[in-house]
C-alpha cells in the first residue's frame, strides 16, 4: 500500500487502551469507486498538516480506501430511543478511525459514517447515501459557523455503489463521511455498562473521560468530588448546547441518549432541519409522531437524557449530588440562550436585564409573522446602520417583502430595538455591525435549499451550489 499524509499523524490509542469490553475490531468495506466530493482544508492545520501539501489522493487513500490504519473500532453502546430503552445498539455503519492530538494539545476523534457493516448493523448495509453525506456536511459547517459546538466534516468520498432506501428515491448514490470531534463516547456508552451491571467498567470509563476531556478536574484530589464535578460540568455543557441549537434555529431530530456526546457536542443529527419559520412545535423527523424531539422541546429532552444518565453514574456518584446539579440546567440554558440571541441581534455585551425584553419581542415577532427565521437575521445584518439610532423610522426601511400584517407586528419590535439603541453608548452602537457579521452568516440551509443543492448534484452532477453555499458560510 502506498503511503499518504494522514499516516504521518501520531495516532493515540486512547479508546483502544480501555479494553475490548468497550469496542469491537472491524474492517472497512471495499468500494468500487472513490471520488472526493468535499475536503475541509480548514481543519488540517489543527491536525498539524499543511493544506497545500495534502492532495486529494491523500484523502482518498485514507478515507475512501482506508490504507494503513488499523485497528478500526466499532464502539458499543445502548440508549433510550423515543423514551424506550434499547440494548441492541452500537456503531452500525461506521467506526472510530483513529485518535490524535491536535496542535492545541487536545485529543480528537476521527470517525467514519458509511464505511461498511459491523456487528451492530442490525441487518443494514452499513452504507451512507451521498445525499445523507451532503446534508451532514452542510449542517456541521453551518452549525460551526453559527457558534454551535459540533463535530465537523473532514471529508466526503463518493463510493460508486447503488443503495436502496425507503425514505428517498432509490437507487441512490453512496458515500463515506469522515467526521472530526472531541469524542464519540455517548450517554449510551455508560448505559450499556449499567445494563451489564459492571460498575468497575463505568468507573474506568469515567476516569478515561475525565482524564482526556475534563483534565482540569484532575486537580481535585478527592475522586468522589471529582466525579461530582464532572456531572455538574456536563450539565452546564449540555445546557449551553441546547441553547445554542435554539438560537441557531436548529432541530436535531433524534435526541436519543445514544446521540448525546459526553463532551457536549452536536452529532448524529441525521433527520435534522434548520427552521424556516420560528415554530417551537416544529419536528424534524417524520417518524416523531408526537413531537417528542420538537425544536422547542430540545432543552427538556436534554435534561431528561441527563437524568437517565444518572442511573449508570449512580454507581460512582451520589444521586442527590446529580439531582442538585440537574436543577441548575434550566437557568443555565435560559441565560446562555439570552446571551447568544442578543449577539444575533447585534449586542455582544448588553446586560441581560436590559436585553431580555428585546429577545422576548423578537420571539413574539418571529412566532406570529410569516418571515423566515434565518432571513430575519440576514436582513438585520445587511440593513443595520448606526443611523437607526436617530429615528425609529429608519429601522428595516428597506424590507418591502413583509406583508402589511407582518409590517404591523414589526413595529413593536422596532420600537424595542430603537429604545436599546437610544440607551447604548456610541462605542456600543459602532460595535453592532461587527457583532451582526460574526453571528449571522449570509446563508440559508433549510430543507428547500438543501433539496435544490441535491437536485443539481443528483440530476446533473453539478456541485457548484454545494460549494457556493459552503463558501458563503465564511462571509
From Swiss-Prot:
Binding residue positions for Mg(2+): 259, 268
Keyword ATP-binding: yes
Enzyme Commission designation: 2.7.7.-, 2.7.7.108
Cofactor or coenzyme needed: Mg(2+); Mn(2+)
Residues annotated as catalytic: 258 (proton acceptor)
A Pfam family recorded for this sequence: SelO
Keywords for this protein: ATP-binding, Magnesium, Manganese, Metal-binding, Nucleotide-binding, Nucleotidyltransferase, Transferase
InterPro entries (alphabetical): SelO
Protein name: Protein nucleotidyltransferase YdiU
Natural source organism: Thermosynechococcus vestitus (strain NIES-2133 / IAM M-273 / BP-1)
